[in-house]
Regions:
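Catalytic grooves of carbohydrate-active enzymes
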Residues: 179-202
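His/Asp/Glu-enriched short active-site or ligand-binding loop at hydrolase and phosphoryl-transfer sites
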Residues: 140, 146-182
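Hydrophobic, well-structured mid-protein blocks that either form specific transmembrane helices
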Residues: 98, 102-148
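Active-site beta->alpha N-cap acidic-glycine motif
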Residues: 18-104, 118, 122, 151
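Charged helix-capping and loop-helix junction motifs
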Residues: 84, 109-116, 171-176
């Protein structure tokens, strides 16, 4: 009975660690850069999107702000002009896998490696950018993700402020308030191009 309880508890801990990217349990992950001083990093996941990405870029340009876009490879190939605009306007790009598949964390490390490299090469071909920034789908990490990150010489990027901007019925004001309450030196803010309409007041 005791052994079974220990096994169950250990399994729960491992599962919990997989979904808590800030713990860095499986792979060293940048979630905050205190050395950056009184600045924060804006990051946008799941793009590019033909409707939302131009609006996000317009807003950033108006405010003179730079951000990092973690792009999905298949979407990048469908909307190469948006990838080129992101790069041309001085924003950083990162890899958010080829399709953002729900089953990505369950793949073999070699399949993950191929996925990351495919996305990296696509971004290079489209916009001439060579990125080693990587954010795993849903922020899930495990030993397979760790091996793929190492093989591809990627730098895993997490977040220290989760906006929850994709939740239904979440207003722009609620999202902004949540972010404002959690601001701090060098924090990394997670936002979304797809499903994150609250940020732009849609």
């Amino acid at each position: 009975m005791y052994v079974a309880a220990v096994i169950i508890a250990a399994g729960f801990v491992l599962f919990y660690c997989s979904y808590q990217i800030r713990l860095g349990a499986y792979v060293r992950t940048l979630c905050r850069n205190r050395a950056a001083g009184r600045v924060v990093a804006l990051t946008f996941d799941d793009g590019p999107d033909p409707e939302m990405t131009p609006r996000v870029l317009d807003l950033l340009r108006e405010r003179g702000v730079r951000a990092t876009f973690f792009l999905v490879g298949a979407k990048a190939e469908r909307h190469p002009e948006l990838v080129r605009r992101i790069a041309a306007e001085g924003h950083d790009t990162g890899i958010h896998t080829w399709e953002h598949a729900a089953g990505f964390p369950m793949r073999s490390s070699w399949a993950m490696t191929a996925d990351i490299l495919r996305c990296r090469e696509s971004l290079r071909q489209i916009a001439g950018v060579e990125t080693h920034l990587f954010r795993p789908p849903f922020g899930v990490t495990n030993p397979m993700v760790a091996r793929a990150v190492k093989r591809t010489q990627s730098r895993c990027i997490g977040w220290s402020v989760r906006s929850f901007d994709t939740l239904l019925r979440r207003s722009r004001e609620a999202v902004a308030e949540r972010i404002a309450r959690r601001l701090g030196d060098g924090k990394v803010i997670l936002l979304h191009e797809v499903g994150g309409q609250a940020v732009l007041g849609k």
